[in-house]
């Protein structure tokens, strides 16, 4: 699985891909200069169960760590992932 990221000053998204095939997207918006809100995560029907959703949220966590950002997980899927990985991801969680 590979990742593309598109980012503007106000919002952005990650795309999970398998070759040229898009598997899913995770959308975020900026909440200041050092934190972003995960708004929505979606996985294409044929990619469900492949780990694409987890890959997208993990990619957001990696991006936050590399840039000293915090994450506000408003998306239900991302929020559930943060609860599941609360000890591992608490360093990037905005509380």
State what each model feature region is.
Residues 12-23:
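Conserved beta-hairpin
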């Amino acid at each position: 699985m590979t990742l593309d990221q598109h980012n503007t000053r106000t919002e952005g998204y990650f795309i999970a891909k398998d070759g040229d095939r898009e598997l899913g997207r995770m959308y975020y918006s900026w909440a200041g200069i050092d934190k972003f809100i995960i708004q929505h995560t979606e996985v294409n029907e044929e990619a469900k169960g492949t780990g694409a959703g987890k890959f997208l949220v993990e990619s957001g966590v990696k991006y936050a760590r590399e840039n000293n950002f915090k994450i506000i997980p408003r998306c239900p899927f991302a929020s559930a992932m943060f609860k599941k990985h609360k000890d591992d991801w608490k360093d990037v969680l905005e509380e």
